[in-house]
Swiss-Prot record:
<dbReference type="InterPro" id="IPR009801">
    <property type="entry name" value="TMEM126"/>
</dbReference>
<feature type="topological domain" description="Mitochondrial matrix">
    <location>
        <begin position="177"/>
        <end position="196"/>
    </location>
</feature>
<keyword id="KW-1133">Transmembrane helix</keyword>
<keyword id="KW-0999">Mitochondrion inner membrane</keyword>
<dbReference type="GO" id="GO:0005743">
    <property type="term" value="C:mitochondrial inner membrane"/>
</dbReference>
<feature type="transmembrane region" description="Helical">
    <location>
        <begin position="35"/>
        <end position="55"/>
    </location>
</feature>
<feature type="topological domain" description="Mitochondrial intermembrane">
    <location>
        <begin position="56"/>
        <end position="57"/>
    </location>
</feature>
<feature type="transmembrane region" description="Helical">
    <location>
        <begin position="160"/>
        <end position="176"/>
    </location>
</feature>
<keyword id="KW-0496">Mitochondrion</keyword>
<comment type="function">
    <text>Protein required for the cotranslational protein quality control in the inner membrane of the mitochondria. Associates with newly synthesized polypeptides and may act as a chaperone that cooperates with OXA1L for the insertion of newly synthesized mitochondrial proteins into the inner membrane. Required for the assembly of the ND4 module of mitochondrial complex I.</text>
</comment>
<dbReference type="GO" id="GO:0032981">
    <property type="term" value="P:mitochondrial respiratory chain complex I assembly"/>
</dbReference>
<dbReference type="GO" id="GO:0141164">
    <property type="term" value="P:mitochondrial protein quality control"/>
</dbReference>
<protein>
    <recommendedName>
        <fullName>Transmembrane protein 126A</fullName>
    </recommendedName>
</protein>
<dbReference type="GO" id="GO:0032979">
    <property type="term" value="P:protein insertion into mitochondrial inner membrane from matrix"/>
</dbReference>
<feature type="topological domain" description="Mitochondrial intermembrane">
    <location>
        <begin position="128"/>
        <end position="159"/>
    </location>
</feature>
<comment type="subunit">
    <text>Interacts with OXA1L; promoting cotranslational quality control in mitochondria.</text>
</comment>
<comment type="similarity">
    <text>Belongs to the TMEM126 family.</text>
</comment>
Amino acid sequence: MESHKPSTSKDDLILNIISRKIKQLPESDRNLLEYGSAYIGLNAAFGGLIANSLFRRILNVTQARLASSLPMAVIPFLTANLSYQSLVSLPLSTGDLNCETCTTTRGALVGLVMGGLYPILLAIPVNGGLAARYESSPLPQRGNIFNYWITVSKPVFRKMLFPTLLQTVFASYLGSRQYKLLIKALQLPEPDLEIH
């Protein structure tokens, strides 16, 4: 059995062509392709702050506002941004993702999981730890921990349904839009190509 080495020269050529074509796009389109993942990250950060606020109210946590808000904004921003960048934007830019449905689906999944559900799930231990530290809410005994957090989380998940769906639809739309912009860029003529 032969071991196949990836053809880096072919991949480099494809990447070079795609990057040249993207540079020909108008600045607003280029910015959407380059910084689209940051929009997903910002929405995830807002979702994290909303989830943090809801859990703080339920658990009556009044201390350490900055200590809980900072990680609830920064961590979801970074994870959603990097996830979208590595699963949607980068494969699009390198030519590894060439299907609009695949791009839209990947964008929606990143928006749902990393932009919607992850910030809510991250808020549970952050605010649970603060509630235990400041004794602001009676916490359960060892046997009831799972049921307690399900009961506490249900109203938060209900209230976060709309922001999570909004994040999913936005990420799906952004994936579709980025795909269409890339197709538009690839259809542009080469400015310095000489025809003999």
